[in-house]
């Protein structure tokens, strides 16, 4: 967990090739890694002072990179090129051969995850490919301070079919905290944040958890799909139990459940709003649900984005008697 996280990987003066005119112009180039503030990108400023003044840079998102290469000296001296999968390229030259080599190695490792054949890089990490593959399923978030946790700051969020995990931004193998999806009472997002309320089932404790992120919509869709899958599993288990009870007690007046389900079932009293919301999600538009002004507190934000609770039917009323947390 990084409270003073710096997303700048490398920066310096270079001569960037113009896409329109094809000429090289001197600029201050900043390479930023992906974070809660945005994706991995190159930012081009007129000079170094413009960064401190927070001017509006020209941004090139570094995604879908095919390769990073050095141009031959006879073509362009001290030049580095980033080739994208659509065969477009961004090319720049450096003031020295040493600087060009540093840019090349940094971009290769950060954009491609490649381990260059250099003794200075040390022994290859055999687990690196698996870790990097898993990293693609993690989102960049900034956990805001909350009374239930001692940690806050920049981290990685991962959603599996059962849990939400937070991982350390510097060491992808260090798990910071986790929440079972079946402990979620409600969740929502806006343009810059993702928020959920967890019950007492989780180790982190009951409360609101808010994350600043540019990927709130993607996180929301992952969480919603996973919770719907758990709810469907819950429904199937209950139907199977009811079927078994009827078969075992056929012809008798007394009904009793023969055993408890083997699958972990959600125990939250708020759980039934998730299954019912699937039917009403298409009826309400995104603008109607999320077009209101930004809430003044985290609770107002969450209440504004909560999945709407459907009107209980006679059949649902029996399921709603699940013991509360």
From Swiss-Prot:
InterPro entries: Docking_Protein_DOK, DOK4/5/6_PH, IRS_PTB, PH-like_dom_sf, PH_domain. Residues 7-112 form the PH domain. A motif (DKFBH motif) lies at residues 265-275. Widely expressed. Highest levels in heart, lung and kidney. SMART domains: IRS (SM01244), PH (SM00233), PTBI (SM00310). Keywords: Phosphoprotein. Phosphorylated on tyrosine residues in response to insulin, IGF1 or RET stimulation. It comes from the Eukaryota. Residues 132-237 form the IRS-type PTB domain. DOK proteins are enzymatically inert adaptor or scaffolding proteins. They provide a docking platform for the assembly of multimolecular signaling complexes. DOK4 functions in RET-mediated neurite outgrowth and plays a positive role in activation of the MAP kinase pathway. Putative link with downstream effectors of RET in neuronal differentiation. May be involved in the regulation of the immune response induced by T-cells. Interacts with RET and TEK/TIE2. Interaction with RET is mediated through the PTB domain and requires phosphorylation of RET 'Tyr-1062'. Belongs to the DOK family. Type B subfamily. PTB domain mediates receptor interaction. This is Docking protein 4. It comes from Mus musculus (Mouse).
């Amino acid at each position: 967990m990084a409270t003073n996280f710096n997303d700048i990987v490398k920066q310096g003066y270079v001569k960037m090739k113009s896409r329109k005119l094809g000429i090289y112009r001197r600029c201050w180039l900043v390479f930023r890694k992906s974070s809660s503030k945005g994706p991995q990108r190159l930012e081009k400023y007129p000079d170094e002072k413009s960064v401190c003044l927070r001017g509006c840079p020209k941004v090139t998102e570094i995604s879908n990179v095919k390769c990073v290469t050095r141009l031959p000296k006879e073509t362009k001296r001290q030049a580095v090129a980033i080739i994208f999968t659509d065969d477009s390229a961004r090319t720049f030259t450096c003031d020295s051969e040493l600087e060009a080599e540093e840019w090349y190695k940094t971009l290769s490792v950060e954009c491609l995850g490649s381990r260059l054949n250099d003794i200075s890089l040390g022994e290859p990490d055999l687990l690196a490919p698996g870790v990097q593959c898993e990293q693609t399923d993690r989102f960049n978030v900034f956990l805001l301070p909350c009374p239930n946790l001692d940690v806050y700051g920049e981290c990685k969020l991962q959603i599996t079919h059962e849990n939400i995990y937070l991982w350390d931004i510097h060491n992808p193998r260090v798990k910071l905290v986790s929440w079972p999806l079946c402990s979620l009472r409600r969740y929502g997002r806006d343009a810059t944040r993702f928020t959920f309320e967890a019950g007492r089932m989780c180790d982190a404790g009951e409360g609101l958890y808010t994350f600043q992120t540019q990927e709130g919509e993607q996180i929301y869709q992952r969480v919603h799909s996973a919770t719907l899958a758990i709810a469907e599993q819950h429904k199937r288990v209950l139907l199977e139990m009811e079927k078994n009870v009827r078969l075992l007690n056929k012809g008798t007046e007394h009904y009793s459940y023969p055993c408890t389900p083997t699958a972990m079932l959600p125990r939250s009293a708020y759980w039934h709003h998730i299954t019912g919301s699937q039917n009403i999600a298409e009826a309400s538009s995104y603008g109607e649900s999320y077009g209101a002004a930004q809430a003044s507190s985290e609770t107002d934000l969450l209440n504004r984005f909560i999945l709407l609770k459907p009107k209980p039917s006679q059949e649902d009323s029996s399921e709603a008697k699940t013991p509360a947390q």
